[in-house]
Amino acid sequence: MSDGGIEFFVLSGFLGSGKTTLLRDFLEQPEAADTAVIVNEVGEIGLDGIVLRDGGDSLPMAMLSNGCVCCQIGSDLAFTIDRLIVAKRPHGTPPLRRIILETSGLAKPGPVLRQLASLAEHRMKVAVVGTFDLTRGTETATFEEAVSQWAAAHRIAATKVDLASVNALSEAPATIAAINPLAEVIALKDRASTVATAFGPLVAAPPLPDVSADVKATHPRLVLCCARPVADISYPDLAAWLDNLAGALGDRLLRLKGLVQVKTLKQPLLIESVGTLFSPPRPLQMADGSQSSFLVIIAHDVMEAELGPIAPSGLFQFSSWQRPDAALRDERRVIKAEWVT
């Protein structure tokens, strides 16, 4: 986290996936004393807020109700965040360090993150925490919202561990990685350790994971592919291709992350998006000094044939995660990526 910057967590997960319980577990920890919470519910009665407030009313909390934060009450969200940041803290409490937004179970993270652009002056460090209900597994993948939530997440926490089988917990990392190989997976028995990791400091994202050759997408509409530059790329061509990719896929683009070496820079550029919202590209020093170029793309209802013609055409060749090569795995071990800001 940048000096003085507030950490902003978007807590995302499908209906009934355990978001409120996960948040409540965290708020019961001493480390949560410097936290403010925003709860968004689609409806006039904020039940989750009542549940979270049960047991104490010292927590700074704001309710956004009667509308989904990702599509209906964006201006209210920005106003609420700004109000929490500038508000005077109660005497004896630590400075505000962290804001957690618990979205409704139907909210997609991409539009939510886009609404934070007006708050750039606060220089917040932002990450999406997703929930994975062990008792339901990938059953909710039939819902577009659930797939979008998992794909956008930087961290995915397994929930309802006490209700799930031992096999469900042990298989969770592989199952989640097949949906979003870019996410840090949190599948722990201890609830305190789970929340400490889920809402832990945003100093740097973990390296891109080492995906083994037997990883397969768990949902037939989900596409996990890798784009490699065919030759040296200029920055204008890269920017145009990314812009056209976002335009061509629209909401079908769920997540993108990787490194691209451009002609005029010594270090590769870190490229990252949640949905069609791209973070500013930034040079990234590789741990071993190597220069690598590839983009991981997570999308749904997309055929590889759609990607090739995107202009400027011929910049990338595409391969599936089902057959990752050793060089790609080595590259992903040494990346020191940064969180979306």
What function would you assign to each model-found segment?
Residues Q285-V296:
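Short, surface-exposed secondary-structure junctions/capping segments
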Residues I38-N40, G130-D133, A157-K160, A227-R228, ...:
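Conserved beta-strand segments of the P-loop GTPase G domain that flank and frequently precede/overlap
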Residues A117-V126, V147-W150, P173-N180:
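A short alpha->loop->secondary-structure connector
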Residues A152-A287, D301-T341:
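C-terminal accessory "lid"/substrate-recognition subdomains
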